[in-house]
């Protein structure tokens, strides 16, 4: 029986938990959260899912156990301000073979290097859950645009740029193979807004980036309205338009005389994605999420300029990243 631990049973953590119910391997699952209310909600969500191939062993506890048995897979789904501390505590308490971290990874620059060294020391293979690259429609985009210079445009209302820009920068890195980029914050609205999660901030306006291979990214979050998220990717050889809310996308390619064709673009929920990720990791020792070292680089190239922009436009000066 494989041991799986989830730390943080809030919105995203409980979705990871739901996904584990369908994993076709016998699991011993421990859910850890300081809030008994969150644990109760997570348990209810887990029990609401269809019965899987195996009835997994379940435990719900409020703290990390010291000197526990080796863990096959841990998923840390806390907020960014607690994740480095929790990761350190876990790795000092048990041998963890595989680890999935949520984004935004951490809220302090120093944590990125410190946790990276700890992961090497403990030989813990680690990925970051930025799942566009494992969603079928976005995975296939790599076939259309691989190693090309692309234009990548996303628009929509209330996207939450601090939270979600990392998804798109990671996807561009996945498509193009280029991980070096610079962002331009001049199009952001100067005053940040409160994020959905208490104590964190968000940006509206337009955030742009230029990758080393010449690819350009433009992400626009309208502060009002209900404009759906539309993703447009184009190169000299292909054009892609995706409407996530409808599960639809259209593709035109030069070798098809630029004729538009509708393609399937269903976006699977986290409660299904994690099922496949867990099965792949436990059976093969790998998955298609971005690995920690690469994601650390992609994170910091975004977070440092955002912090500088925030300090330039705020009376309060931030030494950390108030994003999650």
Predicted regions and their residues:
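C-terminal helix-rich "cap/oligomerization" subdomain common to oxidoreductases
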Residues: 26, 45-46, 73-76, 279-324
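Short acidic low-complexity segments
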Residues: 53-70
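Beta-strand-loop-alpha-helix segment that lines the small-molecule cofactor/substrate pocket
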Residues: 72-80, 84-133
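NAD(P)-dinucleotide binding in Rossmann-like oxidoreductases
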Residues: 197-200, 212-278, 286-293
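Rossmann-like NAD(P)H-binding beta-loop-alpha module
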Residues: 136-151
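Rossmann-like dinucleotide-binding domain that binds NAD(P)(H)
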Residues: 151-228, 293
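N-terminal Rossmann-like dinucleotide-binding module
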Residues: 1-51
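Amphipathic, non-transmembrane alpha-helical secondary structure
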Residues: 14, 18, 65-66, 84-92, ...
């Amino acid at each position: 029986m494989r041991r799986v631990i989830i730390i943080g049973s809030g919105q995203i953590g409980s979705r990871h938990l739901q996904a584990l119910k369908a994993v076709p391997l016998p699991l011993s699952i421990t859910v850890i959260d300081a809030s008994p209310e969150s644990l109760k909600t997570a348990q209810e969500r887990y029990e609401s899912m269809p019965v899987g191939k195996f009835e997994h062993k379940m435990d719900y506890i409020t703290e990390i156990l010291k000197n526990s048995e080796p863990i096959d897979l841990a998923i840390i789904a806390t907020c960014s301000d607690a994740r480095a501390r929790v990761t350190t505590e876990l790795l000092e308490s048990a041998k963890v073979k595989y680890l999935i971290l949520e984004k935004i990874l951490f809220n302090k620059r120093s944590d990125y290097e410190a946790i990276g060294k700890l992961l090497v020391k403990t030989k813990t293979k680690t990925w970051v859950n930025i799942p566009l690259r494992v969603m079928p429609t976005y995975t296939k985009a790599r076939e259309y645009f691989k190693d090309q210079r692309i234009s990548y445009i996303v628009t929509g209302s209330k996207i939450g740029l601090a939270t979600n820009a990392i998804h798109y920068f990671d996807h561009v890195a996945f498509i193009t193979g280029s991980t070096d980029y610079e962002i331009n914050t001049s199009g952001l609205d100067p005053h940040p807004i409160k994020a959905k999660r208490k104590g964190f901030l968000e940006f509206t306006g337009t955030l742009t980036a230029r990758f080393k291979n010449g690819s350009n990214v433009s992400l626009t979050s309208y502060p009002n309205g209900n404009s759906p998220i539309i993703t447009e990717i184009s190169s000299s050889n292909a054009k892609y338009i995706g409407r996530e809310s409808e599960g639809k996308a259209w593709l035109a390619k030069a070798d098809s005389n630029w004729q538009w064709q509708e393609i399937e673009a269903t976006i699977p929920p986290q409660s299904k994605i994690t099922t496949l990720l867990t099965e792949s990791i436990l059976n093969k020792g790998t998955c298609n999420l971005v690995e920690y070292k690469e994601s650390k680089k992609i994170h910091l190239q975004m977070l440092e300029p955002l912090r500088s922009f925030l300090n330039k436009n705020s009376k309060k000066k931030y030494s950390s990243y108030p994003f999650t």
